[in-house]
Amino acid sequence: MLNNAMSVVILAAGKGTRMYSDLPKVLHTLAGKAMVQHVIDAANELGAAHVHLVYGHGGDLLKQALKDDNLNWVLQAEQLGTGHAMQQAAPFFADDEDILMLYGDVPLISVETLQRLRDAKPQGGIGLLTVKLDDPTGYGRITRENGKVTGIVEHKDATDEQRQIQEINTGILIANGADMKRWLAKLTNNNAQGEYYITDIIALAYQEGREIVAVHPQRLSEVEGVNNRLQLSRLERVYQFEQAEKLLLAGVMLRDPARFDLRGTLTHGRDVEIDTNVIIEGNVTLGHRVKIGTGCVIKNSVIGDDCEISPYTVVEDANLAAACTIGPFARLRPGAELLEGAHVGNFVEMKKARLGKGSKAGHLTYLGDAEVGDNVNIGAGTITCNYDGANKFKTIIGDDVFVGSDTQLVAPVTVGKGATIAAGTTVTRNVGENALAISRVPQSQKEGWRRPVKKK
């Protein structure tokens, strides 16, 4: 179906008192992203010509958090209802475009549902998103005559008979810009709340003989709003289980879908296995046959085929080639790169460092600002001393180097191909190819040594 041009209004002016937070409610996160950002992303994916964000409380925080989005900021200085909020945005509506109204605290609305609503909007009428609830207490009821929508009655204004209606208003609707402006101008606050209800435009449209078409979302969670942290946590689990189901059906083995969090985008190969309590953040790619142990955090990283990440490992902004093994208890920080078959063991940290093919750093090591060649052995307790208190410097280690335990490499320093660094050495000068570097105090031995005795 050919759609008109469309702009989106997102209502985000509420204080969120029940969140008990200094942060505006819509900036609280779901799946690692602000609730309102989910809604903005949906609007952009729909192809909105403009996104008008109606704000009030915490405007500076909102503008800072959403500074990268192309938004038209609309101030609602007083919160006098949804109709009043839309009235503030109305001067920006073009007559020949459709206006879609969304909410910053309803984060899981899907693009698919919104597109169906957009397609269903009748010419000159209103498309309205509704659901049926077993217990509709507190929600505006959809009134009908002969099956046709005639209006919406808020719960506090409804009669006992109207309160028996199970079909309720979600607040999401779409209408033509010129019609919307005309109806908004006719709103009054003659109701129990003393507010201007956007829902009153339904009755106004019906009185003009306009058609109102109701559409239902695919899932109830799409239209659930958030007013407190309990509701947010429940919606988080709903979202996460939905993501887990999609991954399971796509061939990813999640050992317990209830203990998996996706806070971004996961691209994966075949036969991927993910154990419990794993968190995926940002954009992550997992190759074929990747295995991730329990308690790992993977963020903005590429993991190659046949890699195995052992429990409680953190990988951030890193790139792993095929057949690498990591952890347990390892940390790969931004700029870490492992070439094919490399191994990083327990309590090893890497930052802005490359570990070559088949190279190993097995235990208790820090590699920062370093280039390590192929087939290198990094002994336990090795540290690249890359910082002099003011600037960072680089360590370069050639292929086939053996670095003994408890070695300190004071950068800038280069170790040539095939060199050996004796255990306990502090390397302060370059080491040539195939050379042995050793710096130790000569060992002495005192026979019959007695330890000091504590004074009683």
Curated annotation (Swiss-Prot):
It is an enzyme of class 2 (transferase). One of its GO terms (biological process) is lipid A biosynthetic process. Binds 1 Mg(2+) ion per subunit. Its cofactor is Mg(2+). Keywords: Acyltransferase, Cell shape, Cell wall biogenesis/degradation, Cytoplasm, Magnesium, Metal-binding, Multifunctional enzyme, Nucleotidyltransferase, Peptidoglycan synthesis, Repeat, Transferase. Coiled coil: none annotated. InterPro entries: Bifunctional_GlmU, GlmU-like, GlmU_C_LbH, Hexapep, Hexapep_transf_CS, MobA-like_NTP_Trfase, Nucleotide-diphossugar_trans, Trimer_LpxA-like_sf. Residues 251-456 are annotated as: N-acetyltransferase. The active site is at 363 (proton acceptor). Pathway: Nucleotide-sugar biosynthesis; UDP-N-acetyl-alpha-D-glucosamine biosynthesis; N-acetyl-alpha-D-glucosamine 1-phosphate from alpha-D-glucosamine 6-phosphate (route II): step 2/2; Nucleotide-sugar biosynthesis; UDP-N-acetyl-alpha-D-glucosamine biosynthesis; UDP-N-acetyl-alpha-D-glucosamine from N-acetyl-alpha-D-glucosamine 1-phosphate: step 1/1; Bacterial outer membrane biogenesis; LPS lipid A biosynthesis. PROSITE patterns: HEXAPEP_TRANSFERASES. The keyword Transferase applies. Its EC number is 2.7.7.23, 2.3.1.157. Acetyl-CoA binds at residues 380, 386-387, 405, 423, 440. NCBIfam families: glmU, PRK09451.1. HAMAP family: GlmU (MF_01631). This is Bifunctional protein GlmU. It comes from Escherichia coli O7:K1 (strain IAI39 / ExPEC). The gene is glmU.
